[in-house]
Amino acid sequence: MKTFVLAIDFTDSAAQVADYALALANQFHARLVIVHAYEPRADSPTDSVHTLARLEQIKEQLTHRSKGSVEVSVVARHGEPRASIKAVVAEEQADLLIMALADDRPYTARFMGSLPTDMIPQTVVPMLILPPCSSYKPMKTVVLAIDLSEPTDAVILGKVKEFVQVLGVSLDIICMDDNPDSQRLEAAKRIQELFDGLPHTFSFLPGYDLTITLDDYSVTHPADLIMMLPKHHNRLAIWFMESVTQQVARQSLLPVLAIV
């Protein structure tokens, strides 16, 4: 993974989000591209100048903190935020998109959602969603929530493995299933074989709501990150339904990494 794109706003939590992205980029030896997408106002023609100045200030601060070990660049892009962020991800050939639920009212972001959760079904690269006011700390344990009702893409599991190896974490794989049949037990066995040589566990857990199941699991199994494998949905479903990954990202107190 060579390039991370951080889509940032200028709320109070922006500095913490930038520090988190910087630490992660440093761990992966990746360059960090910071983008601020905004819709210019007719009554404020100097928006672009002020935006670029603030981004340059953030760039200088991060470059100083990393002592130059992370290449940091900035992009100010005016236009509809979703389209602008997706365009920068494509132009920079990003390997990871990072966004935060950075609403000035964190509980509003958690219960109502925001731009980051809206973008989960649209992302074409892995996407890390940070809860408000996230602070980076070295990770020890990652939870991978997996659905075995459909075949799991080996390429996507390969990306999961890469993240686990670089982060140097143990992996807790969970599947919400009260009574797994032989087919799902066999699928679980194949997945465990893929992670052979890496510290990991696999558990089938009862439940009907993954968010609740993850909360219950975290009581006895503390983790630093949740990984999800979003399913592909048609456009109609994207418009009218919230996916499981979106729901977990919106309500989780932990960062959520959607692997696509």
In which residue ranges do the predicted regions lie?
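Small/aliphatic-rich secondary-structure junction motif
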Residues: 1-46, 140-204, 219-226, 251
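Active-site phosphate/pyrophosphate- and oxyanion-stabilizing loops and adjacent acidic/basic residues
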Residues: 22, 60, 117, 161, ...
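Rossmann-fold cofactor-recognition segment
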Residues: 71-74, 202
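Charged docking surfaces used in two-component/phosphorelay signaling
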Residues: 76-84, 210-211
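Gly/Ser-rich helix-loop-strand patches that form or flank binding pockets
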Residues: 86-135, 219-221, 225-260
